[in-house]
C-alpha cells in the first residue's frame, strides 16, 4: 500500500513540478571549483544562476587528488574551462 502511495505522490510531483533536471548546460561555474577529495568519491560544485536554478557538475576522483585537475582559471574574470571532467550529467 505504501508503495502505491509513494508512486502516486512521485508522479503527482512530476506532473506539477516537471521532471527533475540532472544538468543545466547554462550553469555558471565559479572560481572555487578546485575540490580535493578525502576519500574515493564523486565530488562536484553546486551553484545558482540568477538566484534561481541549482546546478551540479560531478567528477570522479581519488583520495588526495584534485577532482578537476585540468581546469584553467582566469582569476580576474572568474571564468573557468574544464578540460577533462567526464560527463557532467551523471
Swiss-Prot record:
<feature type="signal peptide">
    <location>
        <begin position="1"/>
        <end position="18"/>
    </location>
</feature>
<keyword id="KW-1015">Disulfide bond</keyword>
<dbReference type="GO" id="GO:0005576">
    <property type="term" value="C:extracellular region"/>
</dbReference>
<protein>
    <recommendedName>
        <fullName>Conotoxin Vc22.1</fullName>
    </recommendedName>
</protein>
<keyword id="KW-0964">Secreted</keyword>
<keyword id="KW-0732">Signal</keyword>
<comment type="similarity">
    <text>Belongs to the E superfamily.</text>
</comment>
<dbReference type="GO" id="GO:0090729">
    <property type="term" value="F:toxin activity"/>
</dbReference>
<keyword id="KW-0800">Toxin</keyword>
